[in-house]
Amino acid sequence: MIDFTEEQIQRYSRHILLQDVGVEGQEKIMNARVLVVGAGGLGAPVSLYLAAAGIGTIGIVDADVVDLSNLQRQVIHFTKDVGVPKVKSAEEKIKAINPDVKVETYYEFLDSSNALDIIKEYDFIVD
């Protein structure tokens, strides 16, 4: 059982008030491990929402760097991030939204040579 801090109670109060979530559900969320494949058009907003919800661990796999052309649709990256690996840019924003979230980054492609080793550590995969 997690002993929620006052800050966590306030942060997650809307979840905790929901009959279908409550304290037990928020605890499950905070213990969950989710892998996001790609920090681009889908992975960017998904990562932000997962962090805001309090997912305990978010893994991000992406072998790309932020390009200026990404910024109009990949909301996790900012102009200052151009040239930075997307996983590092995403990690910074996730930690800014919710410092309690653990972020695991994989600056590589997810393919047959590494997929099983990476995904076995996670409860859910978003691709």
Task: Identify the residue ranges that each predicted region occupies.
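Adenine nucleotide-associated cytosolic modules
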Residues: 1-127
